[in-house]
Regions:
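Sequence-specific dsDNA recognition surfaces
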Residues: 20-26, 41-57, 71-102
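Basic, amphipathic alpha-helical recognition segments used for DNA target recognition
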Residues: 40-45, 74-81, 96-102, 118-124, ...
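Short, charged beta-turn/beta-strand-edge "cap" motif at the junction between a beta-strand
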Residues: 112-115
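Non-catalytic DNA-recognition/assembly elements of restriction-modification systems
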Residues: 21-51, 180-191, 196-202
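Extended, domain-scale alpha-helical bundle/helix-rich regions
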Residues: 1-19
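ATP-grasp fold ATP-binding core
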Residues: 68
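A generic structural signal for residues embedded in beta-strands
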Residues: 107-108
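Short coil/turn segments at secondary-structure boundaries
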Residues: 14-15, 53-61, 82, 160-163
Length: 202
């Protein structure tokens, strides 16, 4: 169950356990009645990356695994190449997991807040970047919707302050309010944005 409901003309409430809380003051703008506000952490799984110690060359020499930093991220685009790679030892001792797969959504949440990119290669990434995996998606429609709206949502009002505050942790990200339209509306929004972008580029 998604624990956040929006009644834009009356009030907005959130159920936390058995308690119902009025969060009308937290809602940044009105949305259509068929949409709802959701906490980011209720609709996606997030994974924060890591940086192997720079002083330990064993983690960087003979690197064969792609490692993404913010400078590698293509704003509003696809990451097709990286500047650095990490070794098998780094994978086994630091990351201890498979790389983030090609096609995944990444977002920076430190320094350059809200930059989104799609991975064009399997890769690991640093701790200023999160991998975002929707709990439910169809043909990457929700992924693409988040790809386009997160730069705006994460840099607007209280959201920006929450992410860039002194306490940077999963809680700040989990509490981001995301306007969630029905799936077909998400698809229409993505299609319209891509059409506008294509006209701007050329």
């Amino acid at each position: 169950m998604i624990p956040l409901f929006s009644k834009v003309t009356i009030t907005s409430i959130e159920q936390i356990g058995s308690k119902v809380v009025d969060i009308t003051g937290d809602i940044p703008f009105e949305i259509p009645p068929t949409w709802m506000w959701c906490r980011f952490g209720t609709i996606v799984k997030m994974r924060i990356g890591k940086t192997p110690p720079r002083g330990e060359q064993v983690y960087w020499s003979n690197g064969k695994h792609n490692w993404v930093s913010i400078s590698d991220m293509v704003e509003g685009g696809t990451i097709k190449a990286v500047k650095e790679k990490v070794s098998d030892i780094a994978v086994n001792e630091i990351f201890k997991c498979y790389p983030t797969p090609k096609g995944s959504l990444l977002m920076s949440f430190k320094l350059t807040v809200g930059r989104t990119s799609i991975l064009g290669v399997d890769a690991y990434h640093n701790e200023a970047i999160i991998t975002i995996v929707p709990y439910a998606d169809v043909n990457n429609i929700f992924r693409d919707y988040l790809f386009y709206i997160l730069p705006t949502i994460s840099n607007s009002g209280d959201s920006k302050d929450a992410i860039k505050g002194k306490t940077l942790n999963n809680k700040s990200l989990n509490n981001l309010l995301i306007p969630l339209p029905p799936l077909l509306e998400q698809k229409r929004i993505v299609t319209k944005i891509e059409l506008v972008n294509s006209k701007i580029k050329g």
